[in-house]
Amino acid sequence: MNNKKSQYPQMTYKQAVEHCRYWADQIRADGLDLLTTDYGAAIGVSDQLAYPLEMQTWINSQEYPLLYKVCVYAVTVDNDHTDRASWEKLLELIDKL
């Protein structure tokens, strides 16, 4: 286990879902047109969504497949803010939580 991950505060499932929904609201408020073209705006949103999820040691594809997919897409948009399809898929997945 990554020592950095093990020392990061762990959320409950409910807290993780609330975290995702909060950032989905922020994404929608900012708009995908802005987030796919303005690196500064995008990094502020995507990093704050993705990083805490990445640090959750309990999120895995077997026990929490939907939340795991949200994590994958959160990291995807954090790495490539111009990928509009991934932003859209991220929002779609969060809506299913």
PLM segments and residue spans:
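Acidic, low-complexity, intrinsically disordered interaction modules
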Residues: L32-A85
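Generic structural signal for hydrophobic core residues of well-folded globular domains
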Residues: W23, A74, D78, I94-L97
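Small-residue hotspots
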Residues: V17, A24, A50, V70, ...
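Short, low-complexity interaction segments enriched in Ser/Thr/Pro/Gly
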Residues: M1-N2, M11, L66, S86, ...
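Short terminal alpha-helical segments
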Residues: K5-Y39
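A composition/secondary-structure signal for short, hydrophobic, low-basic-content segments
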Residues: N3-S6, M11, Y22, G44, ...
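N-terminal cationic leader/targeting segments used for protein routing and processing
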Residues: N3-S6, Q15, S61, V70, ...
